[in-house]
A protein has these predicted regions:
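Short coil/turn motifs at beta-sheet boundaries
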Residues: 30, 51-55, 90-92
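A broad, low-specificity signal marking well-ordered, structured residues that form hydrophobic/aromatic
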Residues: 34-35, 58, 81, 97
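Short, conserved charged micro-motifs
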Residues: 67-74
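Small/polar-rich, solvent-exposed N-terminal microdomains that initiate assembly or binding
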Residues: 1-44, 50
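Acidic-leaning, charged glycine-interspersed low-complexity segments
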Residues: 74-102
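Glycine-rich loops and low-complexity Gly/Arg-rich segments
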Residues: 45-48, 59-64, 83-88
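Oligomerization/assembly interface segments of phage tail-like spikes and tubes
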Residues: 54-66, 93-102
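General N-terminal targeting signals
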Residues: 37-39, 52-54, 77-79
Length: 102
């Protein structure tokens, strides 16, 4: 199983449902709560003029309508997960996180 697919499964477990989308097209009708994620960067660790390790960075957005929803806390338990920001649009809460995967 690839690293992205492994992350996908971990996000499904954190959310408690299958509503996890990797770069969904605009035609997908979202149902809340859900998670949308996409690859945003690749970190390269270098030594002796060569790359010895690389990590993909994914932006993970947890969307929900219940202000007490706890999936964000579950995602933050993943290794190398960091919280970035929170905002609300049309009574839908958005928590933006970054998760690194090797």
């Amino acid at each position: 199983m690839g690293q992205r697919q492994k992350l996908h499964k971990q996000l499904e477990l954190a959310l408690g449902s299958k509503r996890v989308y990797y770069q969904p097209p605009p035609s997908v009708k979202l149902e809340y709560p859900c998670i949308i994620y996409s690859k945003t960067d690749r970190e390269l660790l270098r030594a002796n003029d060569s790359v010895y390790k690389s990590f993909d960075r994914y932006q993970v957005v947890v969307l929900y309508t219940d202000p007490d929803f706890e999936a964000t806390d579950h995602v933050l338990l993943l290794p190398w997960a960091t919280y970035n920001r929170h905002y609300a649009v049309n009574n839908v809460y958005h928590d933006v996180l970054y998760v690194y995967s090797d």
